[in-house]
Amino acid sequence: MAASPVDAMRLSPLPILLALVASAPLRAQVEPAVDPLAPAPSSAVPLEEIRRFAEVFRTVQEGYVDPIDDRTLMQSAVRALLADLDPHSAYLPATSASELAEDVQGMYDGIGVEVEVRPDRSLKVIGAIDGGPAHKAGLRTGDVIVAIDGRPAGSLRDADPSRALRGTAGTSVRLSLLRPGEALPRDVVLVRQSIALSSVSGRLLEPGYGYLRIGYFEGDTADELKRQLAALQVASGGPLSGLVLDLRNNPGGLLTTAVEVADLFLEGGPIVSTRGRTAASNVLYRAAAGDALQGAPIAVLLDVGTASSAEVVAGALRDQRRALLLGARSFGKGSVQTVVDLGNGDALKLTTARYHTPAGRSIQAAGILPDVTLPGTAIRGLREQDLPTHLAGDAEVPDGYATGVIVEGESAVAEALRRVKQAAAARQATARRATSAG
């Protein structure tokens, strides 16, 4: 069995709220990190418990009222083994594993929505992919899909009810949505399309000041970011004086890609460390020399939809005093998942580490507070700590302060630009004084 270096664009329970490990080469430096409090992994096999499991398996196999094949029974057992661990560990049967691998290629057929499977098997919308059918139809973070094509989501027999959202491009699907604050569901019909996953977009806000949005972190996000940054510099007629980096509603992706993105804007120092029970899970990532903006100020936008790898970038830039954070407290997913190939087409997605920001903070179930709070829409039940069986955090937010805030619209971009211009003006004044003194 081998760990698979794949991204997680799978539309399933918290589909891309992941910081998946990958083996892609990094410009950043990678060092082993040791967690002195982590217990050593045990290789002991609990023989008595395994005998008990075998007895239960045989009893069900032989005596259940209806015949049940061994593979189905074993898959159920493996799912149950992972069910009580944490919401991001999961068993992926071959169909789900192949869909995950398909998503890594940057293209899939569906409606372009990220969802969380709730205990009643309804689907809570985490975010809609820019330009996809769900985004065009106005699906919002916090909407709950209670029925698909007239069938209650709880009645769908598939282990992952979100698979019903997928289908051949050009086919339609009818969703019943329950929106927060509304008593009755609304129906909306969407036409599936081939979703080309472009993770970065950008534009020039005004001469010298750029805007880059990262929708998620996949294999070539850092390269896309470099291309967009170069295009902005050409459009501006030279190096940028400042940048607004928008990570709102970014549910995460590859940890190694997040490291590459943070590394673009840092001259050195730590980016993130991961701490788990195995040697492979304990890693410190450091930035290599070379800041793509040459120190020009950065403002980062975040909200409750900013999760996992996006939180890695925000935390690294803030702890290194490289960026000002604006918006609302982030989601609070501070764990790393590894995908393990089981050799028969099935796979195991297992939480193997917590990550820590350069200042040593774990954001698990706590999130990252912005430096400047912006107004938004408050909705309860959207954060990591609201998920059943979530990993305990070092500094979880008390329930009374756990409301998630969605920060939408261009007013947030305008405020971020104003702050960046202030910082750029101060930087230029400092440079003039230094030149005058010299």
Where in this protein do the model-derived segments appear?
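Bacterial N-terminal signal peptides
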Residues: 12-24
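Terminal targeting/pro-maturation regions of precursor/exported proteins
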Residues: 26-91, 124, 412, 419, ...
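Terminal peptide-recognition signature
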Residues: 56, 77, 113, 134, ...
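PDZ domains, with a preference for the canonical peptide-binding region formed by the helix
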Residues: 144-176, 257, 333-339
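PDZ-domain C-terminal substructure recognizer with occasional recognition of PDZ-binding tails
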Residues: 124, 146, 160-201, 351
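Conserved PDZ fold ligand-binding element
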Residues: 61, 134-156, 243-246
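PDZ/PDZ-like peptide-tail recognition elements
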Residues: 76, 88-127
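C-terminal "post-core" interaction segments
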Residues: 30-33, 51, 200-438
